[in-house]
Design a protein with these regions (language model features):
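N-terminal nucleic-acid-engaging modules of covalent nucleotidyltransferase systems
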Residues: 1-249
Length: 249
């Protein structure tokens, strides 16, 4: 969790798109499976942890902190995850020499196997074992509330840069893959063949619009092209494959 927490913090405080991509590429290069794939799934919001909801965090912190103090702190900080991470009182106080922080895979595996009744005790125990940045990352992970300026598209571009492949190849595979994406990383590192997507009706990357200038008509044969107006608004792709129908936007 500490490595994942450092990644989130660096992404949050890195304003440039290229800087964020470099951080992600470095993470993919230096962090082993399954940690890097789980971090990717969390950032792209493809990791669903059903046993923990924001209301649970309020209940947990209410057992540790005066209600009025928490209300005032939340009003001042403005973010639930950050407030809980900062105000959470660790029994015996914070210790810099602690070495029992859970790994990202430990947290994910335990929560996916836990019932709604078991989830709170797990989260409470981890909050006690982590520092403030680790608690923040844990809370964001379990609630899915990442706001770090990284879109799924940017994460896929980082994968493409990491493996030196076109981003369109990542997008075509994406909906047929599942976390922690070990076959994807093996291919990108040149250690395995390209994964075969088992998903029916997959997404196909949309070609960007290309304007036609007046001088182009004299050298282009209109019969070779299909053209349409470029409408403003969101794009939607309808895909049909062996009876499976999907809409992508």
């Amino acid at each position: 969790m500490l490595i994942f927490a450092a990644l989130l913090q660096n992404l949050l405080f890195t304003p440039s798109r290229n800087g964020k991509i470099r951080l992600l590429v470095d993470h993919f290069r230096t962090v082993p499976d399954p940690e890097r794939g789980l971090a990717l799934a969390a950032i792209t919001r493809d990791l669903d942890i059903p046993s923990v909801k924001p209301a649970l965090l309020r209940e947990l912190v209410s057992n540790r902190v005066d209600e009025e103090l928490f209300r005032l702190s939340y009003d001042y900080v403005g973010d639930l995850a950050e407030t809980v991470a900062l105000i959470w009182p660790v029994p015996g106080g914070e210790r810099e020499d602690r070495n029992d922080a859970p790994t990202l895979s430990e947290v994910v595996d335990a929560l996916l196997a836990a019932s709604r009744r078991e989830g709170p005790a797990l989260v409470e125990g981890w909050l006690d074992r982590l520092d403030a940045s680790g608690r923040y990352a844990l809370i964001k992970l379990v609630t899915g509330g990442f706001r770090i300026g990284v879109s799924a598209r940017l994460a896929k571009q980082a994968l493409a840069d990491f493996g030196q492949v076109p981003v369109e190849e990542i997008e075509e595979l994406w909906h047929g893959l599942e976390p922690p994406y070990e076959s994807l990383f093996a291919w990108l590192e040149g250690e395995a063949d390209k994964p075969v997507s088992a998903a029916l009706a997959p997404f196909r990357p949309v070609m960007l619009s290309h304007p036609v200038e007046d001088g182009d008509f004299s050298r282009l044969d209109a019969a070779d092209f299909a053209g349409e107006w470029k409408w403003d608004g969101i794009r939607v792709q309808a895909s049909v494959d062996n009876g499976v129908k999907r809409l992508y936007s």
